[in-house]
Swiss-Prot record:
Residues 217-238 are annotated as: Disordered. The lineage of its organism: Bacteria, Bacillati, Actinomycetota, Actinomycetes, Mycobacteriales. Keywords: Acyltransferase, Glycerol metabolism, Lipid biosynthesis, Lipid metabolism, Transferase. Its EC number is 2.3.1.20. This is Putative diacyglycerol O-acyltransferase Rv3087. It comes from Mycobacterium tuberculosis (strain ATCC 25618 / H37Rv). Pathway: Glycerolipid metabolism; triacylglycerol biosynthesis. The active site is at H139. It is an enzyme of class 2 (transferase). InterPro entries: Acyl_transf_WS/DGAT (IPR014292), CAT-like_dom_sf (IPR023213), O-acyltransferase_WSD1-like (IPR045034), O-acyltransferase_WSD1_C (IPR009721), O-acyltransferase_WSD1_N (IPR004255).
Amino acid sequence: MRRLNGVDALMLYLDGGSAYNHTLKISVLDPSTDPDGWSWPKARQMFEERAHLLPVFRLRYLPTPLGLHHPIWVEDPEFDLDAHVRRVVCPAPGGMAEFCALVEQIYAHPLDRDRPLWQTWVVEGLDGGRVALVTLLHHAYSDGVGVLDMLAAFYNDTPDEAPVVAPPWEPPPLPSTRQRLGWALRDLPSRLGKIAPTVRAVRDRVRIEREFAKDGDRRVPPTFDRSAPPGPFQRGLSRSRRFSCESFPLAEVREVSKTLGVTINDVFLACVAGAVRRYLERCGSPPTDAMVATMPLAVTPAAERAHPGNYSSVDYVWLRADIADPLERLHATHLAAEATKQHFAQTKDADVGAVVELLPERLISGLARANARTKGRFDTFKNVVVSNVPGPREPRYLGRWRVDQWFSTGQISHGATLNMTVWSYCDQFNLCVMADAVAVRNTWELLGGFRASHEELLAAARAQATPKEMAT
């Protein structure tokens, strides 16, 4: 038994209706790296052999009686791999457009809460003979950094690693209501002990937020009590999604970063802002003010994590979609990102995780339902959700099949119906765009806007580069 922390539990509480809080993980395999090629029975066997390497795959959640504490993870004695691993063929010709349309259908369904909260679709028929593993993994299990650890456990470092031998598994029966109630009462003192320090941290945060709010300059970060400017992405969720993805050369992103003296994350945020600006211009409503993005920030380093979970928090950053000039936009983005880092360092002891850890389940669930009823008017996640996760630098393998590409994105929410996430993998900078189908009819337009913004910055960087820099 392991109890969910506050953020883990929040991800469950936010579920419901058309809000799906599962994340999307896509690994595209190249079977040509195996002399025997692709085999569905072999893939099924690998999942069977490797399930024990990811203990979360066998964990289901159980609520705490009377809502006295957050839910718990327990091993599922009825775990059935075939209920989680499915097989499907991508419509011809198996290009990225057909694949992404299939992913939209796969994603837009809630996971079965009576089972472990994940599902993998093995998608055959991609162009070039490739195969994709499309995994829905509930955000309650892990944040992006934790998923990196899962990747390291599930995939090989080399194609020649010895087969994994699964040990015997005998899960205990599900705990009774009485047991779960006893565990909640046992854990209650430690929970109560966190109240005083958290209240002090919240009080300090309120003071800091007020100091930030006194200055309307965009060099200070947006705060929770500041409403984001209204836009087309701030609406309630429908049941359908739109999805697109594309790989960019990581070397080009690094070139822009190095030459223009900013971080890779600055480049990413500036390109997101450029993409949103182009999209809104085509919609006839160009932004006249800075927008606000919700951005996850790491709290606990990977080395200090005892088990998978959500150890990250979130803060807000100005998205400078109001600036037309790409270099001015990048400079303003750099200042905004630095301000957000400083703000988070001062307020992280009173972040969403610390507060949610103490609030009763029924209160949080009630607030989540109210946010859904009002179509996200609580303005919790502002205009856009963005994330940039540095992934593996070396290729990974499933058996002898090389992982050719890796894509990942988080969920969207009532009031924040657009998510743009990038994961780097080897020499790739892999972008996903996930949106509500009513809020954004065509995510390929946003992806194209990101590409155009990247090309603008790359051209500007190369125009400024010295001959020595261009040679390297």
